[in-house]
């Protein structure tokens, strides 16, 4: 099955541009045609922060091998899937939106990995289970940034510079990728996307 519909959104199975080991059901709509200010829309794409973090995990599997990994605000599930492929013993993907939950399940299945999927608002997530917490391109507001920083450890993030209050973290980034995006998918053709420890 190469095409599915979730919540009136048509998703097509396609290899991820910068992580070709993984194929996902994704929207063909350009990013600027998705309401990125509405976090409930963001599950349709593999954003560059998620792609960068997935790439880093697959290239450095020792970070996750044999561990329990928690992917926060999982979206399409790319980071969770990468962690499982890289050898994580257990992967928990958390998102609070039902279409995202459906999408993660379908994407895990097409990549032949088992992921525990939890539908819950991250601000209500009380479990302390997890050897490593992962976030791919999650920070669009300061509230989530502060909450995650204070609640979970260790936390590894993949993200371009989206908001000024965490620019200082990029001074200690452990990897930077310049990731291109398809023409028309954003206002720019590429992003410098950083991997960094929010807490460790």
Where are these regions (language model features)?
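S-adenosylmethionine-dependent methyltransferases
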Residues: 1-200
């Amino acid at each position: 099955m190469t095409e599915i519909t979730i919540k009136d959104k048509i998703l097509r199975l396609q290899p991820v541009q910068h992580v070709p080991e993984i194929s996902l059901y994704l929207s063909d709509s350009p990013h600027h045609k998705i309401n990125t200010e509405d976090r409930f829309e963001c599950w349709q794409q593999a954003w560059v922060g998620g792609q960068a973090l997935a790439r880093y995990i697959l290239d450095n599997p020792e970070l996750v091998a044999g561990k329990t990994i928690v992917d926060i605000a999982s979206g399409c599930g790319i980071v969770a899937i990468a962690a499982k492929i890289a050898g994580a013993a257990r992967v928990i993907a958390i998102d609070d939106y039902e279409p995202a939950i459906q999408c993660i399940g379908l994407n895990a299945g097409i990549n032949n990995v088992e992921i525990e999927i939890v539908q819950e608002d991250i601000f209500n997530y009380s479990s302390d289970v997890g050897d490593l917490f992962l976030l791919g391109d999650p920070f669009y507001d300061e509230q989530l940034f502060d909450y995650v920083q204070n609640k979970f450890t260790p936390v590894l993030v993949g993200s371009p510079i989206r908001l000024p209050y965490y620019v200082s973290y990029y001074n200690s980034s452990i990897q930077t990728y310049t990731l291109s995006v398809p023409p028309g998918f954003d206002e720019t053709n590429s992003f410098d996307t950083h991997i960094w420890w929010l807490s460790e």
